[in-house]
Amino acid sequence: MDYNQKSLKLHEELKGKIEVISRVKVGDAESLATAYTPGVAAPTLEISKNPENSYVYTRRGNLVAVVSDGSAILGLGNLGGLSAMPVMEGKCVLFKEFGGVDAFPICLDTQNSDEIVNIVKNLSISFGGINLEDISSPRCFEIERRLNDELDIPVFHDDQHGTAIIVLAGLINALKIVKKDIKDVKIVVNGPGAAGTAITWLLRDFGAKNITLSDEYGILYPSRDNMEWHKKELAETFNKEDVRGNLSDAVKGADVFIGVSKGNLLTTDMVKSMNKDAIIFAMANPTPEILPDVAKQAGAKVVGTGRSDFPNQVNNVLAFPGIFRGALDAKARKITKNMKIAAAKAIAGVISDDELNADNILPKPFDKRVKVAVSKAVFDAAIADGVCRM
């Protein structure tokens, strides 16, 4: 099926995928006066007395802004904010369909980090949460950090943390299959951009002890010249021994390969050099770092990709709707490390022991158990971490 042509037709016919629906029927003078003037003055005054009343008298508690500057749209590159609109509309559809969250696309005509931070800060009083989307690395790290520091609502860059959470969920179940402990395995993360960086830190937070990072120039090591600051930080944290080499060197004896890089980078010889029952998440799109059947023929036990036409799809829609659902319900001020880990464990837990096998380590996006499990886990973790307004 030609999804490109089908999608063009859909978008042309609908002229957009979202709309605003009124929750109030205004059919007479009384209902008009209640929903708008003069009645609306009463909740307005209550909010002016206490800003927290915005969660009582408005829809703010269920609203998320999906913000993008279009600098890293899917695998298409820097096409600008206007071109990002179909993607952001689609993201809003997923928020509603999979999480019951009302979301609005905010596509920006600037790629200046200071301007983006200021715009989002000034818009934030209208929303209960901010989802950053398709903002290029390493700018995305600074933008998210500054917004998290300066706002008291959740700020979540899905390209980073959504992917990291699903990878952790998949890895939890994959390690069960191969009967290995995350504290003991050697993990290679290839492609330390937005997703790869977040994956690495989350795996470390979950207990991983041995992580090697590599990019197109080879293994990251502290004394390497001309590295972006976030790569230097990763190298100094995870490669204190200053180990050097290429991807082939990195994967020798590894138990887990996580690719968020480019297609066809992982060869059969590399897979054969890994430990027995290797786990491979080859998430480059549209062409994975290695195709699942090729990886398995070379000895891999569990293989996941970013594609829906292969088993074990690493799909962010398993995470972000339920995460925001739980965070909004808890009136959380932040999305913490523990909330992310709780979400990953909840996603992994949807797959029962009876269902778990090498081709079924992650639930499907349409599994209704996912939203319930993730939102509850995130809600409970937010309360435990003390980041709620409740």
Regions found by a protein language model. Give the residues of each.
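General beta-strand structural signal in soluble alpha/beta enzymes
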Residues: 105, 131-134, 155-158, 189, ...
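N-terminal ligand-binding/catalytic initiation module
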Residues: 1-155, 375, 381-389
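Rossmann-like adenosine-cofactor binding region
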Residues: 232-301, 308-309
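Solvent-exposed alpha-helices and their adjacent loops that cap or buttress functional pockets
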Residues: 55-60, 96-97, 122-124, 148-149, ...
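Glycine-rich phosphate/diphosphate-binding loop of Rossmann-like nucleotide-binding domains
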Residues: 74, 79-99, 151, 157, ...
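Adenosine-phosphate binding glycine-rich loop
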Residues: 154, 158-159, 282-390
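Short, ordered loop/turn segments at secondary-structure junctions
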Residues: 69-71, 79, 108-109, 134-137, ...
